[in-house]
């Protein structure tokens, strides 16, 4: 922006002072001095005005930004994403007091259903949306848009007292289908395997089924279905015969991570794709987000949001 000012200058003309003995033309003495004073005044005025204008513009921009970030956002879905989604919302609201964000879990399927029913703005999901869900949304005139927000590895966990430290993907599938029922068949002690699984509304349940159990096959009827990653971690920590699966962000020293095909689930192996049960985590919206929703999603995908992904034990986007 050009901050130069047009200053109106009024020329006083030539003024003279007469005496009896001589006449002094003051124009040649006074004019240069007046010009110098005028220049200094102009520069000072211009500088002051420019500073005031910049300050005014900054204040206006801040006010506009605040106005843009006023509103409410509702989010529901994946239990795997719940901790990081809560951290995102709290941090964003701290930075933007005019924004209110409500976050609920309940499972990926529950979140996607809520989005399709029009009761939430974003659905968190630890699995990709299903064809039938897209069809239902389209029948209501919706245009579901997928946003990758993080990467996860589904860790297979057992009790720290369990001597088994590595299972093949094939063995793991047989265990969760109920075809292998005793730990001695995979190098452990003679004890019946206690299967712990997420419930069917969970995206983790769906992804593990597709990747490990078999898309067209079923979990063993003996599998105990639990409502959250934390519930599985707690059960495994309390039962020496238990085996379950949880998101990376829920792994603690109270459980032992079993390698799958020789690769242990970690931030590094999920990031490079070497761990066989790695996946993206998603947020879904009806159409491209606008206004405060767009600002929130951009923030999640930016440096601050992705740092929180790492802080919560998951893998930032590349």
Regions found by a protein language model. Give the residues of each.
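Bacterial N-terminal signal peptides that target proteins for export
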Residues: 25-34
């Amino acid at each position: 922006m050009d901050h130069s000012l047009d200053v109106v200058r009024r020329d006083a003309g030539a003024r003279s002072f007469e005496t009896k003995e001589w006449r002094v033309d003051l124009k040649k003495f006074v004019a240069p001095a007046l010009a110098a004073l005028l220049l200094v005044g102009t520069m000072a005025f211009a500088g002051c005005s420019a500073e005031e204008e910049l300050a005014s513009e900054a204040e206006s921009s801040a006010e506009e930004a605040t106005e843009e970030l006023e509103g409410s956002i509702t989010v529901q879905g994946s239990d795997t994403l719940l901790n990081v989604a809560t951290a995102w919302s709290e941090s964003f609201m701290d930075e933007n007091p005019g924004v209110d964000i409500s976050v609920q879990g309940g499972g990926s399927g529950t979140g996607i259903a809520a989005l399709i029913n029009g009761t939430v703005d974003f659905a968190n999901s630890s699995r990709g949306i299903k064809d039938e869900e897209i069809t239902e949304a389209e029948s209501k005139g919706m245009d579901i848009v997928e946003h990758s927000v993080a990467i996860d590895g589904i860790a297979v966990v057992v009790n720290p007292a369990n001597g088994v430290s590595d299972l093949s993907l094939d063995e793991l599938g047989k265990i969760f289908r109920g075809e292998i029922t005793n730990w001695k068949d995979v190098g452990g002690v003679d004890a019946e395997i206690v299967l712990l699984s997420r419930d069917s509304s969970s995206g983790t349940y769906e992804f593990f089924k597709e990747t490990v159990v078999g898309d067209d096959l079923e979990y063993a009827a003996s599998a105990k279905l639990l409502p959250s990653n934390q519930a599985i971690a707690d059960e495994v920590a309390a039962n020496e015969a238990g085996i379950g699966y949880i998101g990376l962000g829920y792994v603690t020293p109270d459980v032992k991570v079993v390698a799958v095909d020789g690769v242990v689930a970690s931030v590094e192996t999920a990031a490079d794709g070497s761990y066989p049960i790695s996946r993206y985590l998603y947020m879904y919206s009806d159409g491209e987000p606008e206004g405060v929703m767009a600002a929130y999603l951009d923030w999640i995908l930016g440096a601050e949001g992705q740092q929180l992904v790492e802080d919560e034990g998951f893998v930032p986007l590349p």
